[in-house]
Amino acid sequence: MSVVLQKIWRRLALLESPLEKLRKLHLRLRGAVIGKGTRIPRVLVTWPHQIQLGRDCTLQPDIFFNYSHFWMPGPSMIFGDRVFIGRGCEFNIREKIILGDDCLIASGCTFVDSNHGTDALRPMNAQHIETAPIVLGRNVWLGAQCVVLKGVQIGDGAIVGAGSVLTKSVPAGEMWAGVPARRIRPVTTHA
């Protein structure tokens, strides 16, 4: 393909399709807050009024926002500005999930801010549900297929390796990886 055609193709890809505009209108009419310049492809949202997306966010297709509680005033899922969410991510929200500005969430990541209890004397489907918010600071990068569990807070500038399971909070400026995730080293700066 010629260089000219490649440039034209790249510019066309930046245009918002009529279907994407209709999707945004539908979500807004149902209570979602969507910042200017945010791209919304094919996503599934159970309670749109629980979603607040900042400016210039990019969401890839097949993202699932599941607010698993009775109807409550929102929002419970708050994205900052310039957040990128990769294909196939899942947000299971019962309390609150907050992503700071400039976060990069690679494809296939899962966020779960609740958990069933573990009382051996009660059936699993009758257990008390424990919840705690998930909060990511600014400029956080999660590699592909990470799982972030209830109560986890990730500090500004932290990096989490692909396939990690986060069961505890990550301090700012650190790199973590593994199952369960543990500290690898500080994030370095390059001049």
Q: Over which residues does each language-model region extend?
A:
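Terminal amphipathic alpha-helical/low-complexity segments used for targeting or macromolecular assembly
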Residues: M1-G37, D56, D102, G108-C109, ...
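Flexible, glycine/small-residue-enriched loop-and-beta-strand segment within the central core
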Residues: L44-V152, V179, V187-T188
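Short arginine-rich
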Residues: K168-G173
